[in-house]
Amino acid sequence: MAAPRKKTQRKKKDPNAPKRALSAYMFFANENRDIVRAENPGITFGQVGRILGEKWKALNEDEKAPYEAKAEADKKRYESEKELYIATKAQSE
């Protein structure tokens, strides 16, 4: 008989920590999810994701460019917020 597994405690996430940056695909998916649901009523969550993935793969570089730009801007936002968060966290300790 296998020994019972010990539950590991996850470190609680700080609610003041900055939100992670979204990828270009996530910007695309957020923008197109409702459209896919409207075109395919009654499909499951997994099927929505599969269709979005196929649509993303079908885009050429020019069509992906606006989403890549949004992702780059969001990455810069995250990096600056993270630096500020780390600095204020270090001061409070």
UniProtKB/Swiss-Prot annotation:
<dbReference type="Pfam" id="PF00505">
    <property type="entry name" value="HMG_box"/>
</dbReference>
<dbReference type="InterPro" id="IPR036910">
    <property type="entry name" value="HMG_box_dom_sf"/>
</dbReference>
<keyword id="KW-0227">DNA damage</keyword>
<keyword id="KW-0234">DNA repair</keyword>
<dbReference type="InterPro" id="IPR009071">
    <property type="entry name" value="HMG_box_dom"/>
</dbReference>
<comment type="function">
    <text>DNA-binding protein that induces severe bending of DNA. Required for DNA-binding by the FACT complex, a general chromatin factor that acts to reorganize nucleosomes. The FACT complex is involved in multiple processes that require DNA as a template such as mRNA elongation, DNA replication and DNA repair. Also augments the fidelity of transcription by RNA polymerase III independently of any role in the FACT complex.</text>
</comment>
<dbReference type="GO" id="GO:0006281">
    <property type="term" value="P:DNA repair"/>
</dbReference>
<dbReference type="GO" id="GO:0005694">
    <property type="term" value="C:chromosome"/>
</dbReference>
<dbReference type="GO" id="GO:0003677">
    <property type="term" value="F:DNA binding"/>
</dbReference>
<dbReference type="InterPro" id="IPR050342">
    <property type="entry name" value="HMGB"/>
</dbReference>
<comment type="subunit">
    <text>Weakly associates with the stable SPT16-POB3 heterodimer to form the FACT complex.</text>
</comment>
<dbReference type="GO" id="GO:0005634">
    <property type="term" value="C:nucleus"/>
</dbReference>
<protein>
    <recommendedName>
        <fullName>Non-histone chromosomal protein 6</fullName>
    </recommendedName>
</protein>
<feature type="DNA-binding region" description="HMG box">
    <location>
        <begin position="18"/>
        <end position="86"/>
    </location>
</feature>
<keyword id="KW-0805">Transcription regulation</keyword>
<keyword id="KW-0238">DNA-binding</keyword>
<comment type="similarity">
    <text>Belongs to the NHP6 family.</text>
</comment>
<keyword id="KW-0158">Chromosome</keyword>
<keyword id="KW-0804">Transcription</keyword>
<keyword id="KW-0539">Nucleus</keyword>
